[in-house]
């Protein structure tokens, strides 16, 4: 939401096809009428016929509800995973059995991005594309996480399982492109009773520093442990019971509190960090130095 408050036009694409969920932030899960087609449909169709002419208005959903979009905000769009029904699983299975991997999969994702940008160009264009993906080990996750983006935001916790996944993701990010993407790490859902102790912060930062020094930073250019704004420098998003379950922004009874929680300083800091990587000076960004 902070990007929208910065008057940026944002496109979200759900590529976590094993557990697509971005659409459930904006529509009830059982309301299929609001979603026509999504990422799974695009990949299946383009894989069968790379020259297929696609009407992107069937894929791109303008999110315009006044319950979560104010009149002075940028524009928000969504390409969902697809309609979440039994047919979705069949489409996903077909993709998995069509030898859709490696460079072919990467080419289809690049074409999806191009088609989205072309479709929205006449409506003011897109400033940021946010791609939701799990940092897994299959081709789709590896391509979306490491080979396509200018930057990657990694969400994790201080646990063995989380650190193992983060380490693999950081290693992949550092070696998949000639110019490695920038990285931001987030300690998600941390703290107790709304507070994150200095000990907890220090422990997470130390482990993050170890992983980035070993797998991401060049040997001759390694920042200090407490260097601010570097890849290993965590953003701490406190645990919120309100955000721990479903986040139904379409629910008029809950949206005010949800928007309040999503306006917490940590989310602003994350947005400012992203914008600064692209040389932008966010409105209100001076707060970082206060």
Residue ranges and their predicted role:
Residues 17-121, 247-249:
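P-loop/Walker-type NTP enzyme "switch/lid" segment
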Residues 175-290:
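C-terminal lobe/tail of nucleotide-utilizing enzymes
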Residues 68-78, 125, 179-181, 228-233:
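A short helix-to-beta-strand connector/capping loop
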Residues 11-14, 78, 130-132, 236:
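A structural signal for short, well-ordered beta-strand segments and their strand-loop junctions
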Residues 5-6, 11, 108-223:
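Conserved catalytic-core segment of NTP-binding enzymes
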Residues 101-109, 161-166, 259-267, 271:
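Phosphate/oxyanion-binding active-site loops and adjacent basic polyanion-contact surfaces
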Residues 19-21, 87, 161-162, 192-194, ...:
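Eukaryotic short linear interaction motifs
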Residues 1-23:
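Walker A/P-loop phosphate-binding motif and the immediately C-terminal alpha-helix
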């Amino acid at each position: 939401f902070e990007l929208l408050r910065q008057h940026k036009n944002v496109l979200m694409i759900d590529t976590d096809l094993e557990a697509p969920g971005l659409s459930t932030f904006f529509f009830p899960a059982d309301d299929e009428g609001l979603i026509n087609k999504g990422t799974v449909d695009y990949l299946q169709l383009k894989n069968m016929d790379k020259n297929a002419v696609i009407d992107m208005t069937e894929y791109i959903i303008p999110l315009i509800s006044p319950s979560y979009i104010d009149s002075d905000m940028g524009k928000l769009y969504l390409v969902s995973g697809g309609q979440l029904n039994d047919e979705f699983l069949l489409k996903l299975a077909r993709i998995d059995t069509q030898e859709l991997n490696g460079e072919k999969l990467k080419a289809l994702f690049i074409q999806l991005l191009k088609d989205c940008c072309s479709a929205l160009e006449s409506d003011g264009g897109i400033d940021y594309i946010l791609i939701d993906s799990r940092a897994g080990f299959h081709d789709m996750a590896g391509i979306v996480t490491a080979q396509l983006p200018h930057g990657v935001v990694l969400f994790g916790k201080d646990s063995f399982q989380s650190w193992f996944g983060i380490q693999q993701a950081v290693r992949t990010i550092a070696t998949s492109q000639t110019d490695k993407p920038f990285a931001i790490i987030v300690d998600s859902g941390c703290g107790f009773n709304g507070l994150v102790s200095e000990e907890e912060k220090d422990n997470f930062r130390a482990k993050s520093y170890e992983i980035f020094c070993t797998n991401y930073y060049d040997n001759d250019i390694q920042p200090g442990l407490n260097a601010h704004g570097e890849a290993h420098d965590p953003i701490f998003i406190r645990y919120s019971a309100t955000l721990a379950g479903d986040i139904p922004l379409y629910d008029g009874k809950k949206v005010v509190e949800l928007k309040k929680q999503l306006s917490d300083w940590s989310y602003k800091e994350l947005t400012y960090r992203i914008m600064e990587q692209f040389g932008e000076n966010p409105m209100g960004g001076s707060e970082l130095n206060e």
